[in-house]
UniProtKB/Swiss-Prot annotation:
It comes from Mus musculus. The gene is Lrrc34. This is Leucine-rich repeat-containing protein 34. Expressed in testis where it specifically localizes to germ cells (at protein level). Not detected in other tissues tested (at protein level). Expressed in pluripotent embryonic stem cells and multipotent adult germline stem cells. The keyword Magnesium does not apply. It comes from the Eukaryota.
Amino acid sequence: MEKLQAQYCYLCSENIRKTNPFILNILQKLDEEIEKRPKEKFTVNIAGNNRLDSGQRITGEDFWLLSKTLRNQPCISGVDVRYNLIGDVGAFYAAKLLQKQPSITYLNLMFNDIGPEGGELIAKALHKNKTLKYLRMTGNKIENTGGMLFAAMLQMNSSLEKLDLGDCDLGLQCVIAFSTVLTQNQAIKGINLNRPILYGEQEESTVHIGHMLKENHVLVELHMCKHGMKNYGLQQLCNALYLNSSLRYLDVSCNKITRDGMVFLADVLKSNTTLEVLDLSFNRIETAGAKYLSETLTSHNRSLKALSVVSNKIEGEGLVALSQSMKTNLVLSNIYIWGNKFDEDTCVAYSDLIKSGRLKPDNTDVEPYMVDEHIYLSEVSNGLKRHYYWAPTYGETYMPSSSAGFALVPVGEHL
C-alpha cells in the first residue's frame, strides 16, 4: 500500500497545487504509526487549533486533495478536521468521501464554516452510507434548512449512532423534527442539540423531547444545553424519565432551572434506575435544590454515578448535604461543585471525603489546601466534558478525569 504522504504529494503535483506543510507533517507521522502497527485502525487528526503544529488551517481545496489521498485506505477509520476552514466546498468532498470510503466510522467537521448548503450535501450522503457511526457538525451554521435535512436523513439511515448538532443555529422546527424522528429511529444512541435558536417562553422544545423520551428506548445520551429550559420544561423531561429505561446521560446545563425544578428531579430519581450522569451546571438550584437532591441520593437512588452542580448559587449548607449523601451512597463516585459559595464547613467536608478515599481526586473539580490551619478548596481541571470543545495538544489526548461523562457512559470511541 502506497504511503499517505507520497500519495498526497503525487496528487498535489498532478493537480498543480501547492502541498500544505501542515497536512504533510500529519501524514508523515501517520505513515510511521501505520508502519509500526499495520493491523490497527487510525484517525487522521488535522485539528486547526493545534498550536504545536505550525502551518495554516486547511481550506476546502486542501480537503479535496486530502480526501482523494484517503480513498482506498482501509486502515483509516476516522477523519478529524476540527477548527479549519473547509466550508461548503470541503463539505462537498466530505460527502464524496462518505460515499466512496466505507472504512470511515468517525467524521469530525466541527467549526469549519459549513453552511446550510454544505449541511445538505453531508445529510444526503448519509442516506445511503451504512458505516459511519459518529458525526460531529458542532458550530457549523447549517441553520433550520440543514437541520431539517439531517432529521429527514435519520428516517433513512440505520447505522449512525451518535450525532452532534450543537451550536448549529437549529430552529424550533428542527428540534420538533428530531423529536418526531427519534420516536422511530432505533440506531441513534447519543444526540447533541445544544443551543438552538428559540423564540418565546413556552418551552416547546422540552415538551416535544419529553414525548420522544417516553417512546424511545434506545437513546443513551442527550445534551440540551442552552434551551432556555425552566422548571416546567424540566418537569416534562422528568415525567418522561418515569417511563424511559435507556437514558444514562442527561445534560441540561446552562438553562434557567431553579430550586422548584429539583423537586421534580429528586422525585423521579427515587424510582429511575437508569440515569448515571446528570449535568446541572450553570443553572440556579441554590441550597434548597441541592438539599432536595441530597435527600434522594442519601435514601433512595443507587444508580447515579456522576453529578455536576457547578455554578448553581449553592451555599455551604447545600454543599455539605451533598457531601454527606456520598457517605451513605457508595455508587455516586463523581461530584463537581466549583463556582458555588464555599464556607469552612464545605471545605472541611470535601477535604475529609478526599482524604478518606471516598472521593478520588480525579473524580471532582476541587482540591483541598491549608493556609494558617484553615482548609480551602482550589479548582482542578476535571469535569464531565472539559474537552468537548478542545483537546490537549500534548500528553494524553483523552483523559477520563477531564471527560468523566463520556468515560462513564461511552457512546462511540471519540468525544
